[in-house]
């Protein structure tokens, strides 16, 4: 599948030491496996794979080099699992504040369209690519950092925050706004219909329909915030 190759998606088997055994067989030292975050040490001193039993999403830097990984349990296993997603720990080569998921695959499209869509998760990015919208990156649920904004600003000054239409999505759209403004970015906000995230919405619509929805519903940040404050005050001018 093209999208699997494009994002270098993988799967770590349900054997919780498969990578450990294969890596050590090939001569990789215990310290290296721990330091890179691929494995962790148990109390008894044995090693366990960090991402066992998960779909793997590699984090690529702007040059396409792998810096770290995200791992997600499959839907059938999410019940009772405390962490649906796990990520590589910070290391000498992976600093989450400086990276954006999908930036390598998106950079040429961002320049071409002079705009970037910011979403929350890995699957949001991938679903939008499948829908034909490629100028999209994710900050994976963390607050935007100055480093991430400056990275985006190398390619465009225009950003649309694209999030779920529920309360959590509204809060997410407000995070990092001040920093975006301080870095001179032009901001628009688009909240999807309640109950949809970019992943589910992209699965229901083709690229043309999705782009038309964005065009019809994205709002300038000032207008978006004013409307939000009006709703919160229930149109009471005193509030």
Name what the model sees in each region.
Residues 100, 146-149, 153, 169-177, ...:
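Amphipathic alpha-helical transducer elements in NTP-driven molecular machines
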Residues 123, 144, 163-173, 191, ...:
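Acidic, metal-coordinating catalytic cores used for nucleic-acid/nucleotide bond scission
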Residues 122-123, 133, 184, 190-192:
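Alpha-helical interaction elements
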């Amino acid at each position: 599948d093209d999208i699997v190759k494009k994002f270098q998606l993988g799967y770590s088997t349900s054997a919780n030491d498969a990578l450990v055994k294969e890596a050590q067989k090939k001569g990789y030292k215990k310290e290296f496996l721990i330091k890179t975050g691929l494995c962790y040490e148990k109390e008894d001193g044995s090693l366990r794979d960090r991402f066992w039993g998960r779909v793997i999403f590699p984090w690529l830097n702007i040059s396409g080099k792998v810096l770290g990984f995200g791992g997600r349990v499959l839907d059938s296993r999410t019940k009772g699992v405390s962490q649906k997603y796990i990520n590589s720990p910070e290391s000498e080569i992976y600093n989450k504040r400086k990276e954006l998921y999908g930036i390598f695959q998106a950079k040429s499209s961002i320049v071409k369209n002079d705009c970037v869509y910011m979403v929350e998760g890995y699957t949001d990015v991938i679903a939008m690519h499948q829908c034909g919208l490629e100028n999209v990156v994710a900050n994976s649920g963390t607050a935007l950092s100055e480093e991430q904004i400056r990275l985006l600003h190398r390619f465009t000054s225009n950003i649309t925050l694209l999030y779920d239409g529920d309360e959590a999505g509204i809060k997410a759209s407000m995070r990092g706004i001040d920093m975006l403004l301080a870095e001179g970015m032009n901001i628009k906000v688009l909240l999807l219909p309640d109950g949809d995230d970019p992943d589910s919405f992209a699965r229901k619509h083709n690229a043309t329909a999705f782009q038309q929805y964005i065009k019809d519903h994205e709002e300038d940040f000032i207008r978006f915030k004013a409307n939000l404050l009006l709703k919160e005050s229930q149109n009471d001018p005193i509030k």
